């Protein structure tokens, strides 16, 4: 199998993102990795961390080759101002967005086969005068994708969400038949096309305690979730199990058979995922016209430049991207 190109964005320059991408130089990789960041920032952070790495300028027209240990290809995006590890600077907010724009455009024009994103700081980007709610929404806008699905995965568990960063009080009204149907279609399609699962089995959480208990604890299951799932089963032959109570859906007897668990809201499924795989889980954006994976943690400003950052989630994100790229090439 020929090598592909994966672009890696370093995220917030004052956080641990630069530390994480520099750590990638410690080993060989089967595909070519292109780090999208300020080259001088990487050189400075490498010196701070005592990492010996050769930073090479990325040339699009050069042959695609597997990544060699001790080197990193860099697509240079200049910072607005110098960076001090651990100290946020709104002046560099636009720099972060430029790295994401470059990565998205490169994937959409076929230059890159996947994006792996380091952690960003939403607050400092907004303080720079840019309305930014996260990578997921940004890439959806860049690719003109009307609806995307957030998946978080770790070994033995894939979860996806019907609603994401929404106040809990607003969740019930956001779960409509139309939205649930769209989310299930995207999840099912990407499990087939990106994960190469021919007939995925999706387990679906109810919204209310005990999945509503026949309407005693809420009518959302009866009025919205159950009829939508039944319609999808009948029309498309999808294997959809549920709605099941969220307090039992994560039992081993279900997880052994589930290709993915669909939760209704953020904190319904993510505590289980992070308990099961903290530091080894990955965020995958479904529905985009390209592969995008990311760490499941923040910028950890207090660890930047210290050598104490845990690269587990970042390496897992890259491993998932490589797996999905390889499956796409088959």
From Swiss-Prot:
Query: Which reactions is this enzyme annotated as catalysing?
Result: 4-(phosphooxy)-L-threonine + NAD(+) = 3-amino-2-oxopropyl phosphate + CO2 + NADH
Family of the protein in this entry = Belongs to the PdxA family.
Gene symbol here is: pdxA
A GO BP entry is: pyridoxine biosynthetic process
Full protein name:
4-hydroxythreonine-4-phosphate dehydrogenase
> One GO cellular component from the entry?
cytoplasm
Q: Which UniProt keywords apply?
A: Cobalt, Cytoplasm, Magnesium, Metal-binding, NAD, NADP, Oxidoreductase, Pyridoxine biosynthesis, Zinc
Record pathway = Cofactor biosynthesis; pyridoxine 5'-phosphate biosynthesis; pyridoxine 5'-phosphate from D-erythrose 4-phosphate: step 4/5
Q: What broad class of enzyme is this?
A: oxidoreductase
More details: The active site is located at the dimer interface.
Cross-referenced Pfam families: PdxA
Record NCBIfam families: pdxA
Transmembrane feature ranges: none
Q: Which cofactor does it need?
A: Zn(2+); Mg(2+); Co(2+)
What quaternary arrangement does the UniProt entry report?
Answer: Homodimer.
Keyword Cytoplasm listed: yes
Does this UniProt record's set of keywords contain Ion transport? Answer: no
- Top-rank taxon of the source lineage equals Bacteria
Q: What is its EC number?
A: 1.1.1.262
Q: What does the cofactor field's note say? A: Binds 1 divalent metal cation per subunit. Can use ions such as Zn(2+), Mg(2+) or Co(2+).
Subcellular location field:
Cytoplasm
Offer an example of a GO molecular function term for this protein: NAD binding
Residues given in the record as a divalent metal cation binding sites? 165, 210, 266
Ligand binding (substrate): 135-136, 274, 283, 292
